[in-house]
């Protein structure tokens, strides 16, 4: 269930072949492969990549097609053990200005295919909002490795569109940010930046 760049490249190549698209936005756990070196194993515990095709005329139609032919329950996944999770631009709840901090990943195993990779702190915000067990594991590993920073997350959280966070009380967001800070082994401090009412 561990992702690596060879698997990432194979999945991107398959997605490009299936969709006719050459550019994808890569979010989720596997995005760390497009940004980091010496990546902790706990950040790579996934067998999927989360992508969408930003240049497609109908992004959702491409997403649905990728899900059907390369997704979790597809023959492709059964044969390869890895799969494409087709997502949409709203799947990852990130700050509105995240596109200004992206890099492009061009793997040697997927020539001609580009993955647009958000900053890891923007992806970390999305994971902090989802807060599943696998997200907390990823956040803990990234924080301890110095790849993500709770203070940066705190500065950016208010730039996430309000409709994407309205179901999570502000005090709960602050509590989660505080817990991310504690993953470093230091006392939590993010929740004390402002008074929780």
Per-range role (PLM):
Residues 1-197:
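Compositionally biased terminal segments of proteins
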């Amino acid at each position: 269930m561990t992702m690596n760049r060879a698997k990432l490249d194979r999945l991107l190549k398959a997605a490009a072949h299936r969709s006719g698209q050459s550019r994808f936005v890569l979010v989720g756990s596997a995005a760390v492969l497009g940004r980091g070196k010496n990546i902790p194993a706990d950040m790579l515990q996934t067998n999927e990549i989360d992508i969408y095709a930003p240049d497609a005329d109908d992004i959702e139609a491409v997403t649905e097609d990728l899900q059907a032919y390369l997704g979790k329950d597809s023959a492709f996944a059964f044969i390869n053990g890895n799969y494409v999770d087709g997502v949409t631009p709203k799947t990852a709840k990130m700050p509105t200005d995240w596109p200004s901090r992206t890099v492009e990943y061009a793997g040697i195993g997927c020539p001609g295919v580009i993955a647009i990779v958000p900053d890891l702190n923007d992806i970390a915000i999305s994971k902090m909002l989802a807060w599943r067990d696998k997200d907390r594991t990823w956040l803990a590993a990234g924080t301890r490795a110095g790849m993500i920073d709770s203070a940066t997350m705190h500065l950016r959280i208010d730039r996430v569109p309000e409709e994407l966070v309205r179901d999570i009380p502000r005090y709960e967001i602050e509590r989660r940010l505080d817990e991310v800070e504690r993953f470093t082994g230091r006392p939590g401090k993010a929740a004390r930046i402002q008074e929780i009412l």
